[in-house]
Amino acid sequence: ILNRDDVPSRLSGEMIVGYFLGGTGYVAALPDYLGLGDSPGPHPYVHAASEATASIDMMRATREFCAQQSVLLNGQVFLTGYSQGGHACMATHKMIQEQLGEEFNLTASAPCSGPYDVSGSQAQAMVTPDPYPAPYYLPYVLFSYGYVYPDLYADIGEVIQEPWATSLPPLFQGNNGSGEVDAIMPAAPSEILQDSVLQSFS
């Protein structure tokens, strides 16, 4: 999700998943991640810890709401997500398994089509000369991780070449969609990277 309004709290198109699950008897909790919806600041895209805490906070709020509304829950927890949601699903599963097993009875987890190995196979895919179907992914991760880890780089120009070092940042203020980013990106995302970055992967 790139646009801060394209989230469950704004009844985005993905809410159909919540409606479907609710219609089949599940209580569905679809979180907005940090930096999206009403949450201030940049969105830490594919940042496992913040995705997991947002999801767990939403699960706790949902459980409390159900108690207030006298909705009985059976205690089973099912997790799923697609793309970034798949990454968030796996991060949430990991946090529950490692830290919150006594609070949540994790019954099943189905992460789908997510970038799970961000610093491994996903990073390698980004530095190849091959086209990538969602070029916006690379700059989104770079801006996001620069926000989460401020020592990563002092200026985006250290990582991204011109003209993209100038043209991309305004598109990551929460008001644009991935299509607008892809429109100015090369088919092979690695073309925007500084040679020094590419050399560090060789």
Give residue spans per PLM region.
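Gly/Ala-rich beta-loop-alpha elbow adjacent to hydrolase catalytic centers
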Residues: 81-89
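A conserved short beta-strand
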Residues: 101-114
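Short beta-to-alpha linker loops that shape the active-site pocket of alpha/beta-hydrolase fold enzymes
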Residues: 32-36
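Active-site signature of alpha/beta-hydrolase-fold catalytic machinery across serine-
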Residues: 91-95
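Short, surface-exposed "cap/lid" segments of acyl-processing enzymes
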Residues: 1-25
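Gly/Ser-rich "nucleophile elbow"/oxyanion-hole loop immediately N-terminal to the catalytic nucleophile
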Residues: 60-82, 99-100, 104
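Alpha/beta-hydrolase active-site loop
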Residues: 45-68
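Accessory cap/linker subdomain of secreted extracellular hydrolases
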Residues: 115-202
